[in-house]
Amino acid sequence: MPPSPLTDIQVRYLGRRDYRETWSAMRRYTDERGPDTPDQLWVVSHPPVYTLGQAGRREHILDPGEIPVVETDRGGQVTYHGPGQIVLYPLLDLRRWGLGVRSLVSALEHTVISLLAGYGIASEARDDAPGVYVEGRKVASVGLRVRRGCSYHGLAVNVDVDLEPFLRINPCGYPGLEVTRLLDLGVPTPYERLEADLALHCLEAIVEYGNGGAA
């Protein structure tokens, strides 16, 4: 059986943090891990920034304007982070949990799917484009990096984020992809409550998709 997430994954609520600094801290934490390093789940938001994954192409950034663009080492294409978005970064030793990359992606998607189901909202994942969708509109994005068997980067959920910056890119490399947010879906959006709810759903999904689970 996998360890209990409520005792063996430390949840850190970090508030608003610069993207580059957070990325650097994730890499440092991963590189310095040892056999006894605890797993952590970071809950954070970022000032406005576009991030370009390893598969990303600059032509998908249509008009960044004053918003900085950061080329990162996560998988995937281009996305936007900004205030009003909750970002979860699972810093996990995947072997402890019996997770592979695909099953961790599924766990992160299920985090949002299960949260929305609690509000009576049907959502789904797509095989061709990781993330969570409500009637074809993307409400959450997933992008990961695994190094030395350990994960970083993660899941971004649109709560009441300004959607205009998404119009300046092809989200996740898909021209015309529509984006939505929890506010427009009728989900009550007290931010601190949603942070805690998403963290709990994520911990539960890690167990479900880990050893002997749904992976």
Curated annotation (Swiss-Prot):
Enzyme Commission (EC) number: 2.3.1.181
One GO term of the biological process aspect: protein modification process
Compartments, record wording: Cytoplasm
Keywords annotated in UniProt: Acyltransferase, Cytoplasm, Transferase
Keyword rRNA processing: no
Pfam families: LplA-B_cat
Note: In the reaction, the free carboxyl group of octanoic acid is attached via an amide linkage to the epsilon-amino group of a specific lysine residue of lipoyl domains of lipoate-dependent enzymes.
PANTHER family linked to this entry: LIPOYLTRANSFERASE 2, MITOCHONDRIAL-RELATED, OCTANOYLTRANSFERASE
Family: Belongs to the LipB family.
Protein name: Octanoyltransferase
Native source species: Alkalilimnicola ehrlichii (strain ATCC BAA-1101 / DSM 17681 / MLHE-1)
